[in-house]
């Protein structure tokens, strides 16, 4: 309530007379300042200046004067009575409770819930803040915005500023700012202000004028940034303006930056100044923390250098990624990509890069294709899932981050590398991928001011280059057709091999692709003939390192001419064409050193040592080459290598197990009944496996074999194998229904069932499916009399083979057998094509939400592609070619259309067929007897 001045004065006198021991109320300047804000224009001493708002005792509690109707209730809290009582002699004694009336309760509730604010004296050490004072917050720029602030952190520590100031002091750098030191005499300017700079802000507070640096934190790199403030801003439009703390350059004090001290605020706020004591300067000089990595570095003239670019990718954030803070002296045309240095393309780049002219054009095509190397990504967007083996696998992500993850500096994820190489054509072209790999490979490490940092950069780049060579090696092993079909890529690949002498494994991968399609036994025959023909008929020692055993081994000598044998290989090959076969017959046997055979293979096939070694190991496994070991016979080639490498006194000698040329004594026949079932199964295996091995991965992409207009162009090998399979199945049915005599027809059935049994034994499931399909043809299965005449053993065998190839439960029996992966094996290609069809139809290449690559589909496709390639790498080395049988299948087999097959089937078991009537009458006569 509001009282008149005279009434207030009389009340104060009465209180002071009744309470002589109570202290006299005096208003301090700070209290008066508070009173001016809460009770404007009123004094606390009650004298002059108008009436004050008071809460005092009424009728229920003591002798206080009469109250106005607006506030008739006594209050124990009187802002003018420091004793806290109602005042007067008749005040209630302590501990006595007096019931209050209903009116008093209601009015007291209004007072307690109203705007009345009782005065409580503050401690003298605590400064009184304005009602609009607030705790300042410092703005923190995120990596995405590179300086634009969207987060806030509370400015509590000034250690970063101190360390950065000492770094600038030690490097003799000065920071100049445009200081706005407008002195504001208004007492309401004691709030905090924030000044915005180019890359950060300084925020000053009234309690502690602290200046904190802007800290930019990434997934693995923390960069401390400090900038200056050039203008002041108020926290809100209604708040009074305040002066921001500034850092002034002082050339007289050795360009040292002095941090601001907290200013004491009483009734008015003086301008904020920067001062630092001598002891603080000495302590600052003693402590020299490691220099941070400023985003902006300033010099004495105030000009700013370009900011260091951030990392272009954080796609390796989940794979123990680390990075090194870049120093301010690093050139601005380099990027730290997942811990590696990636040089941006400049106009002065030389054309002597790996890959020749094609590689020089690669840097120009990167920016136009997808700009993979220069894409700036702040957060990893790769999505992972747990697979069946409880391992994390990539299931989705942007194309550029998938490529970055492929060639990172860490240990390679070979499952991801294999999946990527086998399926990258779904979202990227081969040239684009090779260009990106070459850009990463050719990146040169920029020199920095720190030797330690430069060494770390070199180690990172060496790991990246090593990983890229491994990736290209996997690419050659899995998809060499990408280089064979593209002449420019093929040239760049061989240029890379020539310019990288330490890339031995990449060279071996190319050599394996050269030799993979050469029949091993044909190669053996050529090796044997040329080495034997290089010897004279009398068995003397030749330049090729061979030794004759015509004198029962008495002339066996150590051959030390292995190094010179390569010079005579051309002459020996020329002499082999003019020599007669009688020369080979005259030679009983000869012994050759390991070096001699290795040199012949390396020079004749233009391959490396490792590939030649693998060929000899296969020949030893086939037991077509023997060794004079300790116990005679065959020895392991690895032990021979150790002996040859250690340069032992006597090098191991090898011999060919068969020196006579294979002469086929069988006469060519146009009837398959003249050939054994085992030979037919083997020759069909060789014919079809050659087609299966020729299937390229690109023929399986995008279901190209199902497009009627282009299937023979895009998938020629798949269509050749499909055509061959249909041809064999129709040939089986044709041979059965075109055999008129019932007994011969039963023999034909028995022969085909035997061929199917041999196909299963040698793991030729593709030919097995063809034979069973031909026997299950409706034109054959309807021959009831023929099947009745078939012996029980063959009937049971046929039923067993049919159950093995049943499609029930998704080919359960066949898939379980295929999982054992016994090699060599020719799988049924139709099931692989069916699986690819289901995966393609049920999954999209890109996710519908954000157009990211659906890498889960790529993993599913890779599981099929990997299985196909596994069986392609294990051919039937032990099978020799039977030219008569292969000629029969190429030229002399007869195939009838479906209509004619059914017509023959109806005729051979109809009464109109005299042979059928004759055989039936004989059977009836035998039955009657």
UniProtKB/Swiss-Prot annotation:
Residues 1-15, 247-256, 295-305 have a biased composition (Polar residues). Keywords: Guanine-nucleotide releasing factor. GO terms for biological process: chemotaxis to cAMP; positive regulation of calcium-mediated signaling; Ras protein signal transduction; regulation of adenylate cyclase-activating G protein-coupled receptor signaling pathway; regulation of cell motility. Induction: Up-regulated by Pseudomonas aeruginosa, PAO1 strain and PA14 strain infection and down-regulated by phagocytic stimuli. GO terms for molecular function: guanyl-nucleotide exchange factor activity. Residues 676-911 form the Ras-GEF domain. CDD domains: RasGEF (cd00155), REM (cd06224). Residues 390-528 form the N-terminal Ras-GEF domain. The keyword Transmembrane helix does not apply. Residues 16-33, 68-80, 169-191, 203-246, 270-287 have a biased composition (Low complexity). Pfam families: RasGEF, RasGEF_N. One of its GO terms (cellular component) is plasma membrane. It comes from the Eukaryota. Promotes the exchange of Ras-bound GDP by GTP. This is Ras guanine nucleotide exchange factor M. It comes from Dictyostelium discoideum (Social amoeba). The gene is gefM.
């Amino acid at each position: 309530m509001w009282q008149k001045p005279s009434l207030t004065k009389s009340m104060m006198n009465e209180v002071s007379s009744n309470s002589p021991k109570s202290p006299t109320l005096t208003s301090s300047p700070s209290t008066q300042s508070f009173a001016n804000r809460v009770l404007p224009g009123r004094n606390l001493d009650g004298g002059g200046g108008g009436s004050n708002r008071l809460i005092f005792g009424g009728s229920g509690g003591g002798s206080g004067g009469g109250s106005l109707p607006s506030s008739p209730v006594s209050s124990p809290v009187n802002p003018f009575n420091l004793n806290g009582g109602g005042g007067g002699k008749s005040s209630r004694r302590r501990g006595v409770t007096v019931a209050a009336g209903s009116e008093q309760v209601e009015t007291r509730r209004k007072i307690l819930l109203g705007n009345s604010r009782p005065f409580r004296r503050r401690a003298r050490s605590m400064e009184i803040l304005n009602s609009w004072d607030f705790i300042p917050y410092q703005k923190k720029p995120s990596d995405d915005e590179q300086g634009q602030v969207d987060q806030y952190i509370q400015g509590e520590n000034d250690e970063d500023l101190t360390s950065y100031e000492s770094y600038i002091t030690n490097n003799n750098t000065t920071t100049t700012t445009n200081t706005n030191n407008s002195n504001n005499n208004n007492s309401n300017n004691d709030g905090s202000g924030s000044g915005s700079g180019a890359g950060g802000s300084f925020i000053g507070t009234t309690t502690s004028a602290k200046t904190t640096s802007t800290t930019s934190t990434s997934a693995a790199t923390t960069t401390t940034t400090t900038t200056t403030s050039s203008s002041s801003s108020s926290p809100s439009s209604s708040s009074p303006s305040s002066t921001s703390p500034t850092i002034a350059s002082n050339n007289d004090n050795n360009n040292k930056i002095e941090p601001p001290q907290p200013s004491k605020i009483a009734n008015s706020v003086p301008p904020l100044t920067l001062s630092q004591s001598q002891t603080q300067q000495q302590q600052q000089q003693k402590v020299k923390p490691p220099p941070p990595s400023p985003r902006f570095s300033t010099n004495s003239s105030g000009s700013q250098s370009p900011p260091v670019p951030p990392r272009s990718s954080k796609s390796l954030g989940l794979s123990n990624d680390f990075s090194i803070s870049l120093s301010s002296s690093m050139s601005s045309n380099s990027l730290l990509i997942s811990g590696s240095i990636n040089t941006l393309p400049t106009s002065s780049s030389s054309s002597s890069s790996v890959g020749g002219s094609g590689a020089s054009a690669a840097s120009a095509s990167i920016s136009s294709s997808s700009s993979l190397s220069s894409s700036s990504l702040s957060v990893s967007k790769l999505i992972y899932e747990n697979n069946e083996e409880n391992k994390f696998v990539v299931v989705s992500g942007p194309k550029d981050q998938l490529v970055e993850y492929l060639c990172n500096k860490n240990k390679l994820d070979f499952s991801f590398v294999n999946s990527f190489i086998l399926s990258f054509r779904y979202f990227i072209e081969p040239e684009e991928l090779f260009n990106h790999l070459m850009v990463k490979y050719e990146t040169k490490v920029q020199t920095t001011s720190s030797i330690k940092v430069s060494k770390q950069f070199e180690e990172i780049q060496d790991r990246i280059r090593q990983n890229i060579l491994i990736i290209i090696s996997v690419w050659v092993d899995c998809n060499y057709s990408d280089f064979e079909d593209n002449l420019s890529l093929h040239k760049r690949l061989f240029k890379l091999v020539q310019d990288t002498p330490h890339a031995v494994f990449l060279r071996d991968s190319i050599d394996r692709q050269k030799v993979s399609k050469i029949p091993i036994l044909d190669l053996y025959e050529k090796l044997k003939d040329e080495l034997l023909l290089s010897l004279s008929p009398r068995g003397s020692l030749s330049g090729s390192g061979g030794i004759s055993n015509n004198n029962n081994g008495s002339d066996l000598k150590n051959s030390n001419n292995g190094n010179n044998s390569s010079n005579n290989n051309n002459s020996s090959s020329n002499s082999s064409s003019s020599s007669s076969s009688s020369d080979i017959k005259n030679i009983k046997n000869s012994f050759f050193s390991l070096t001699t055979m290795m040199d012949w293979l390396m020079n004749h096939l233009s391959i490396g040592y490792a590939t030649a070694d693998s060929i000899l190991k296969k020949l030893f496994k086939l037991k077509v080459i023997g060794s004079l070991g300790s116990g005679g016979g065959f020895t392991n080639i690895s032990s021979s290598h150790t002996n040859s490498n250690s340069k032992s006194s006597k090098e191991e000698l090898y011999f060919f197990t068969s020196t006579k040329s294979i002469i086929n004594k069988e006469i060519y026949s146009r009837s398959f009944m003249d050939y054994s079932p085992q030979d037919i199964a083997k020759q069909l295996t060789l014919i079809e496996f050659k087609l299966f091995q020729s299937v390229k991965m690109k023929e399986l992409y995008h279901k190209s074999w199902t497009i009627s207009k282009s299937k023979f162009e895009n998938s020629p090998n798949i269509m050749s194998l499909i055509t061959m399979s249909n041809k064999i199945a129709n040939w089986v049915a044709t041979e059965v229904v075109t055999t008129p005599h019932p007994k011969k027809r039963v023999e034909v059935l028995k022969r085909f069932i035997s061929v199917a049994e041999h196909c299963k034994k040698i793991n030729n499931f593709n030919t097995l499916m063809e034979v069973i399909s031909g026997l299950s043809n409706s034109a054959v299965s309807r021959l009831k009399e023929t099947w009745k005449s078939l012996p029980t053993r063959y009937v049971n065998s046929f039923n067993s083979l049919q159950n093995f190839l049943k499609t029930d439960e998704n080919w359960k029996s066949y898939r379980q057998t295929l999982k054992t992966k016994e090699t060599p094996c020719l799988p049924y290609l139709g099931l692989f094509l069916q699986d690819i069809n289901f995966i393609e139809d049920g999954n999209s290449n890109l996710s519908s939400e954000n157009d990211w690559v659906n890498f889960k589909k790529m993993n599913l496709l890779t599981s099929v592609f990997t299985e196909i390639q596994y069986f392609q790498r294990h051919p039937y080395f032990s099978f020799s070619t039977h030219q008569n049988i292969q000629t029969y299948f190429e030229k002399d087999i007869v195939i009838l259309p479906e209509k004619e097959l059914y017509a023959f089937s109806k005729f051979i078991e109809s009464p109109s067929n005299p042979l059928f009537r004759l055989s039936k009458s004989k059977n009836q006569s035998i039955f009657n007897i």
